């Protein structure tokens, strides 16, 4: 991409406290997917190799839902304090999305204030559902109302759907269930009226929106038919809602996927993401080269995906540009 100046909005990190919490819960994988090693030093080495200027770090699946309620607030605070410390040490190389102790709504509201007002993190990470409660559920209305008031940037990462059992098919959840769960979340966010009610949230979905680009018209028809919002949706409103989301291009580095995504949304809604360290390091450079060489993207469009769109979302990074 131009200038090899990528802003990577989909990158993950771990803290000692988070690793300890995973072990205490008996979790040694992400729904069958091995948990990789990570250090800031090794991440920066790879960023330099790949031409990534800044990574916005977040906790990946399984998020925090596995933690007992009594421990979740402290775990979220520890993770966010660690993220803020990394940013202080590497202000131009690192950004961060704050973890919230959901489904504890009061604790989450408190952590939003601390993370954005005190720690000055760049946004919030949420998950497609928390213990089976999908984003868009009325139980999370207070969270989205506050994020809307703040015009916050929110990155939504998928988790395994309720009832997932890897033994049924033999594949870890990230292989296919993650993109399906992103699609479910998008559908519920629109159908519940949350997108309509909270237009100021800047919400990024992972992996090119999952299966949404391919299923958009089918999903749209059924939101119009079964959507719970009042007044009812029109087909035009639903298609506009699809364009409201931002989409990272992680895992859409092949022609039919990117063509479908670009048919659904304009170029100013696309953001670069690597999914490091879960994505194999050997797969990241070819994915960068694919986006860089797409014939249907001109130089300005490539620059927008590389960093221009992200700089509009993250003023702290723009100040360092």
What are these regions (language model features)?
Residues 7-11, 55-57, 95-98, 124-126, ...:
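Hydrophobic faces of well-ordered beta-strands that scaffold small-molecule active sites
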Residues 33-38, 64-65, 102-108, 131-138, ...:
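Acidic-and-aromatic substrate-binding clefts and catalytic sites of carbohydrate-active enzymes
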Residues 58-192, 320:
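Active-site gating/metal-coordination segments in enzymes
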Residues 164, 171-190, 202-321:
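H/E-rich (His + Asp/Glu) clusters that bind or coordinate divalent metals
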